[in-house]
From Swiss-Prot:
It comes from Drosophila melanogaster. GO terms for molecular function: ionotropic olfactory receptor activity; ligand-gated monoatomic cation channel activity; odorant binding; olfactory receptor activity. The keyword Nucleus does not apply. Odorant receptor which mediates acceptance or avoidance behavior, depending on its substrates. The odorant receptor repertoire encodes a large collection of odor stimuli that vary widely in identity, intensity, and duration. Forms a complex with Orco to form odorant-sensing units, providing sensitive and prolonged odorant signaling and calcium permeability. Involved in the behavioral responses to esters. Involved in the behavioral responses to butanol, pentanol, hexanol, octanol, propyl acetate, and butyl acetate. This is Odorant receptor 35a. Residues 57-64, 161-177, 295-302, 401-409 are extracellular. It is a multi-pass membrane protein.
Amino acid sequence: MVRYVPRFADGQKVKLAWPLAVFRLNHIFWPLDPSTGKWGRYLDKVLAVAMSLVFMQHNDAELRYLRFEASNRNLDAFLTGMPTYLILVEAQFRSLHILLHFEKLQKFLEIFYANIYIDPRKEPEMFRKVDGKMIINRLVSAMYGAVISLYLIAPVFSIINQSKDFLYSMIFPFDSDPLYIFVPLLLTNVWVGIVIDTMMFGETNLLCELIVHLNGSYMLLKRDLQLAIEKILVARDRPHMAKQLKVLITKTLRKNVALNQFGQQLEAQYTVRVFIMFAFAAGLLCALSFKAYTNPMANYIYAIWFGAKTVELLSLGQIGSDLAFTTDSLSTMYYLTHWEQILQYSTNPSENLRLLKLINLAIEMNSKPFYVTGLKYFRVSLQAGLKILQASFSYFTFLTSMQRRQMSN
């Protein structure tokens, strides 16, 4: 059972950054390699079903805890279990969508790494520029790694202190104290934690990488067009200048259309999961900020988690805005092809007319910027990230006012 190995068009393996190398080991969110045999695929499905059942069990146990604390009107204890429950439900929705589109994801990634991913061997400068935009996301991945590490240390202290505490706030509908029941449940805690944590930083890293490399491909398209136009102007082959520019723009448009089509595939692949991610973000940030605010020393895990989620949203939003800016400038790119100079020097009136019609078509085709969206409701942009933070702050002030009211009573 081998997970999909990204490769360039020539078959060479792509060297993945460490967050994606870790994410590739996630048996729920990373597809299988096409070479995987029948029994390997069967085993993978069994693991996926087992993981889904464990998710459901954790959902039930954590929800029981939340209901118990809500009935006791214990806001602080209630919000202790809320972040892990929200991220668990989010993971359930996202994993379900992934499992229903597993084969499509593998084919999509195959297209990306073969055609869109910027090859550092051919374009080292552009690759460094694009890869530099991923540094913040890798820092976020390290912060998420710190969060799950702190959660996973808990079993060690549990053994030392001879207490039977689970990693998350849970109440089971049966007696979980016997060792033969407690240990398997604790191991499922660890399994869930690793799968969800790698999902949190891994899928966001993958989405950011898809967007920045698509953006970089558009930038290469613009650079290559400008360099080719300069050659036409320098050569000044007057009878053929208009035709040369027309052929160049036609070739560029074909690449442009291919990139646009990949953008639509990216939208189709991620629109549901982006919606789920953004829909849960405000509530999650609210709960995390409240716990970090009420007792920062005791709840440092929540503070780190809050910081990671905030930076993740802003970084993803900025990357989405960069792509929108680049695609919005494509119409200007075609307008600034020095067609006035070409027409001035050209001695072929019929080709001049065809050239003008083609430029008008190119401008019209690229009249709107491209955004990755969440079911057309959320846009992956910096503005959307700031709005989510604003909403979470509003919820946070509401919770703090509730806490003050409880304390006064």
